[in-house]
Amino acid sequence: MIYQHRFVIARGGRLVKRHAAFQKEALGALEEHGSVLIGAWEVWIGPEAGCSVYQIRQFESLAAWEQHRERVHRDASLNDRYRSNLSPINDFVETAIVKRVEESPQLPTVWGTVDSVRGMPRGFFEQRTLYFRPGTSAAHHRVYFEQLVPALERDGARLQTFFDTVIGPGTTNTGSHRSIELRRFPDMASWQRWREAQESDKELATLVKEVWLSKVERVESVLLYPLDYSRMR
């Protein structure tokens, strides 16, 4: 499987309008054309909070993703609706193609319908985007999965997935130096306990601040809340 990771900004109080227009004009049509929207989150804390969303779509392969794009481009009705009702709302869209790292927790390959998850309980997600110097991601991943992930599975926190970038920012001819981590928390209190433990637990603090961060060039973090049409919740 490969995944499309997308960031959409709609400033000036237009995000709610964007949610409604996306569900009405595009959500069903895009799924009919072969993509599965597995996750959609509003940014609650972080840059562009209250005016941006992250989306993840699942495809069987890069070829399937390209075929999906071609079908969408040929759909004149969808394109007309998008230009009229969605494009004027969006300020910025950034897209990358990512692939789950082998050591990462598995994601389902088959998902229920969007309507089957509406109204179901939702947790919170922290998304961290990790940047590495070219050629150093493999060394980071060894430390990350062998030491950091087990230590951070506490206070209700669970790593949901970990991606490397295949196409987009942070890629070179020889590989990826940009990864995306998604971790779920049952509630904000759980996230706060988890984060405070990285200060109060001296052994954990050393692991995070000295061992792990020595392998990372830069970290960007946002707290996300699933939209009601998000399958990941």
What are the functions of these language-model segments?
Residues 2-17, 102-169, 174-189, 228-233:
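Surface-exposed interaction/gating patches
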Residues 16-39, 45-50, 58-101, 146-147, ...:
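An amphipathic, aromatic/His-enriched active-site/gating alpha helix that lines ligand/cofactor pockets
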